[in-house]
Amino acid sequence: MAERANDIRPGQVLEHNGGLFSVISIMHTQPGKGGAYIQAEMKNIQTGAKYYERFRSDATIRRAILDEEEYVYLFTEGNIVNLMHPSSYEQIVINLDLLGEKKAYLQDNMKIKVVTYQDKIISAHVPDHVTLTVKETESVIKGQTVTASYKPAILENGIRVNVPQFIKEGDKIVLHTPDNSYYERVKE
């Protein structure tokens, strides 16, 4: 879909120089001499490389049309992840590397968002919040309750995270996956 460069927004995906680029940030600039332009910070979806591009504000850019579908995680075999569409029961396989560091969060029956461009899978995402059990943590140190303090913990999948002092071994917690941070304790 062709648009003016003035309409670029962070989060959009553009077709540019033969690749797909996710817009990270933009800055409109009106110099004292010459025409206005847009400075865009972009990330190549295939390679992950950051890229800076300057567009004239009246230039035409092409926004990529992406399809996003939710699949259910079945199992991992080597470097291959098997997923199933919840309504059609169609099974697909994706490369484990598409999930990056987030592959440690995979759990049975987890919903995985798969993004495609022209019927080719370009990315996959785990949910923003995942429930995990605390496998190992330090005991509470008395007198450290004046300010919000955190202690290290190891979760069932081996990830290390800082948790509040009241969390004990065996507690279930919700983890915020985009930044690997504690979100809340599961209420039972």
UniProtKB/Swiss-Prot annotation:
Main location: cytoplasm
Segments passing through the bilayer: none
A single BP term in Gene Ontology: peptide biosynthetic process
GO molecular function: translation elongation factor activity
Keywords for this protein: Cytoplasm, Elongation factor, Protein biosynthesis
Subcellular location: Cytoplasm
Family annotation (CDD domains): S1_EF-P_repeat_2 (cd05794)
UniProt xrefs under InterPro entries: Elong-fact-P_C, NA-bd_OB-fold, Rib_uL2_dom2, Transl_elong_fac_P/YeiP, Transl_elong_KOW-like, Transl_elong_P/YeiP_cen, Transl_elong_P/YeiP_CS, Transl_elongation_fac_P
Domain of life of the organism encoding this protein: Bacteria
Entry keyword tRNA processing: no
Pfam (any one): EFP_N
Matches recorded under PROSITE patterns: EFP
Entry annotated with the keyword Cytoplasm: yes
Pathway as given in its UniProt record: Protein biosynthesis; polypeptide chain elongation
Any one of the GO CC terms: cytoplasm
Family named by the database record: Belongs to the elongation factor P family.
Function text: Involved in peptide bond synthesis. Stimulates efficient translation and peptide-bond synthesis on native or reconstituted 70S ribosomes in vitro. Probably functions indirectly by altering the affinity of the ribosome for aminoacyl-tRNA, thus increasing their reactivity as acceptors for peptidyl transferase.
Record-given protein name: Elongation factor P
Gene: efp
